[in-house]
């Protein structure tokens, strides 16, 4: 099964009334171990490097976000400043000049969406939430 259509849907869900998308890169990883579910070849793929996926998964699996609080959230080799976590399911982070990142867990996956600098992270949050909630509704 290809999960890449979920990335297209996530980008579409982030569009505002004018049709501007507020997600430029995204991916889905497994909650157990952080392995990529989506392919790096997708036009909007967020490409996690090295231990970034496993480290993100470890924090969400344990619901201990101390590593994010002290060392930031790392994605694509960039360090994003941790802003907050909500209900042990959602993490928001930002890097000046590079945009923001929203991460939300379902039962078995973590959905990540990147908002470009100048974009509306609120739209990114909504789009990531739609996909994560859909996966959750499927028991995933």
From Swiss-Prot:
Pfam families: Profilin
Function comment: Binds to actin and affects the structure of the cytoskeleton. At high concentrations, profilin prevents the polymerization of actin, whereas it enhances it at low concentrations. By binding to PIP2, it inhibits the formation of IP3 and DG.
Name of the protein in its database record: Profilin
Signal peptide positions on this chain: none
An annotated Gene Ontology molecular function: actin monomer binding
Recorded family membership: Belongs to the profilin family.
Subunit structure: Occurs in many kinds of cells as a complex with monomeric actin in a 1:1 ratio.
Regions annotated as coiled coil: none
Any Gene Ontology CC annotation: cell cortex
SMART domains associated with the record: PROF
InterPro entries recorded: PFN, PFN_euk, PFN_sf, Profilin_CS
PROSITE patterns referenced in this protein's UniProt entry, alphabetically: PROFILIN
GO BP term, pick one: regulation of cellular component organization
């Amino acid at each position: 099964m290809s999960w890449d259509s979920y990335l297209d849907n996530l980008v579409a869900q982030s569009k505002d009334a004018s049709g501007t998308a507020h997600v430029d890169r995204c991916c889905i990883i497994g909650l157990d171990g952080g392995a990529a579910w989506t392919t790096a070849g997708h036009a909007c793929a967020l490409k996690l490097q090295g231990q970034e996926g496993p480290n993100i998964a470890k924090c969400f699996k344990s619901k201990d976000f101390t590593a994010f609080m002290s060392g930031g959230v790392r994605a694509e080799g960039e360090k994003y400043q941790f802003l907050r976590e909500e209900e042990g399911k959602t993490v928001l982070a930002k890097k000046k000049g590079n945009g923001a990142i929203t991460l939300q867990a379902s039962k078995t996956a973590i959905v990540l969406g990147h908002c470009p600098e100048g974009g509306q992270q609120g739209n990114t949050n909504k789009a990531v939430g739609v996909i994560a909630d859909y996966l959750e509704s499927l028991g995933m």
